[in-house]
Amino acid sequence: MSAMDLSSLQTVIDTAFDNRDTITLSTKGEVRDAVEQSLALLDQGKVRVATRGEDGQWTVHQWLKKAVLLSFRLNDMEVVKGGPGASTWWDKVPSKFEGWGENQFRAAGFRAVPNAVVRHSAFIAPNAILMPSFVNLGAYVGEGTMVDTWATVGSCAQIGRHVHLSGGVGIGGVLEPMQAGPTIIEDNCFIGARSEVVEGCIIREGAVLGMGVYIGKSTKIIDRATGEVMYGEVPPYSVVVAGSMPSPNTMPNGLPAPSLYCAVIVKRVDAQTRSKTGINELLRD
């Protein structure tokens, strides 16, 4: 079958997903071809699960998430070779690097340190660096970004250009529920060691998260200067650290009620200051 245009791909994928209970390992023809082509386009970075408009708003292309989900119904489990000591794995998603040699790595233009795992349909842009880390299917990692040791980039997560994901960082994946958007880290962000950003939250351009900051949809993000409380999105060029919110309540035993975790914006800087100032200096109170 010849390659379909994006509009045709979307139509086939949407229809197949609406009838997904009929999709099995034996499904052939147009549906299988459309899913495989969609995943190949994701893998090559020619399409993305989410794209940013000129107004800064992100548009989620749900049909591409549907293509990823349909691939699980279409593909059987199989032995994956290549482990140390001739060990193997058991999965239905191949490695992005399956069959790659020197020519493919040079053409792709990024570094992949031994034990970096990237699943097929994830895109890694040129000049990115992958330390021993994990990038799940449908994700996008931008140019010049560092994915440090034991960091994980979840399914369909969108990581911008020149981002630093420090050691042990977790960027959550969002495939389901279908209406949920992916977790997004915009350009030039720094995410401190062991931090977690999940549940489709957005970290806007140039923001800095200190070590051990956890942000989900229900996490209070408090601007210390104004008292503003926000959820799900860190504003551009914000410097954020882990904090706690005192409770106004008293427990029955007369003691103050426990404080609850929050993320605190300790300052906001402009792009010029962000580019000229070291991360540690920004995080000092």
From Swiss-Prot:
<feature type="binding site">
    <location>
        <position position="111"/>
    </location>
    <ligand>
        <name>substrate</name>
    </ligand>
</feature>
<dbReference type="InterPro" id="IPR001451">
    <property type="entry name" value="Hexapep"/>
</dbReference>
<dbReference type="GO" id="GO:0008666">
    <property type="term" value="F:2,3,4,5-tetrahydropyridine-2,6-dicarboxylate N-succinyltransferase activity"/>
</dbReference>
<keyword id="KW-0963">Cytoplasm</keyword>
<dbReference type="Pfam" id="PF14805">
    <property type="entry name" value="THDPS_N_2"/>
</dbReference>
<dbReference type="InterPro" id="IPR037133">
    <property type="entry name" value="THP_succinylTrfase_N_sf"/>
</dbReference>
<dbReference type="InterPro" id="IPR050179">
    <property type="entry name" value="Trans_hexapeptide_repeat"/>
</dbReference>
<dbReference type="InterPro" id="IPR005664">
    <property type="entry name" value="DapD_Trfase_Hexpep_rpt_fam"/>
</dbReference>
<dbReference type="Pfam" id="PF14602">
    <property type="entry name" value="Hexapep_2"/>
</dbReference>
<keyword id="KW-0457">Lysine biosynthesis</keyword>
<keyword id="KW-0677">Repeat</keyword>
<keyword id="KW-0012">Acyltransferase</keyword>
<comment type="similarity">
    <text>Belongs to the transferase hexapeptide repeat family.</text>
</comment>
<dbReference type="GO" id="GO:0005737">
    <property type="term" value="C:cytoplasm"/>
</dbReference>
<keyword id="KW-0220">Diaminopimelate biosynthesis</keyword>
<comment type="subunit">
    <text>Homotrimer.</text>
</comment>
<dbReference type="GO" id="GO:0019877">
    <property type="term" value="P:diaminopimelate biosynthetic process"/>
</dbReference>
<protein>
    <recommendedName>
        <fullName>2,3,4,5-tetrahydropyridine-2,6-dicarboxylate N-succinyltransferase</fullName>
        <ecNumber>2.3.1.117</ecNumber>
    </recommendedName>
</protein>
<dbReference type="InterPro" id="IPR011004">
    <property type="entry name" value="Trimer_LpxA-like_sf"/>
</dbReference>
<comment type="pathway">
    <text>Amino-acid biosynthesis; L-lysine biosynthesis via DAP pathway; LL-2,6-diaminopimelate from (S)-tetrahydrodipicolinate (succinylase route): step 1/3.</text>
</comment>
<feature type="binding site">
    <location>
        <position position="148"/>
    </location>
    <ligand>
        <name>substrate</name>
    </ligand>
</feature>
<dbReference type="GO" id="GO:0009089">
    <property type="term" value="P:lysine biosynthetic process via diaminopimelate"/>
</dbReference>
<dbReference type="InterPro" id="IPR018357">
    <property type="entry name" value="Hexapep_transf_CS"/>
</dbReference>
<dbReference type="InterPro" id="IPR023180">
    <property type="entry name" value="THP_succinylTrfase_dom1"/>
</dbReference>
<keyword id="KW-0808">Transferase</keyword>
<keyword id="KW-0028">Amino-acid biosynthesis</keyword>
